[in-house]
């Protein structure tokens, strides 16, 4: 958090850890992508293209994708950016537990407080179709973030989640209420 807001220097500060052709560690690289998103939190216009490229170029590494998803989520927070949403949806649809969990959370961050129907129509059915509990947890948090501050508009979704057979949705219910 010490570098949050250093938009101009962010990439150079993290350069030794960012993904390159001579890979160091996928954990360092994924963490650096997430850190880059934090530096550009809610001011991500200048870095989202880089993060989207990293997300697509490193599709073979769930760890790097995890960091890129979270970085995109934080950098594009509450932007409703459809390009980011679509890329995150592709990661979610790959049905890989680690990257999918981050994609679910990141979709919620990008669509924070929008109540976006398209996001909800992706997340809720997907949670029923996947066998990965990690993905379901990420989706539950994502749903809560999408419905952030929607108050009465969230009531029907809250009722739906209360009746749902997916127990983790009770967490989403609780988070939406808070």
What annotation goes with each model-predicted range?
Residues 1-178:
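Alpha-solenoid helical-repeat scaffolds
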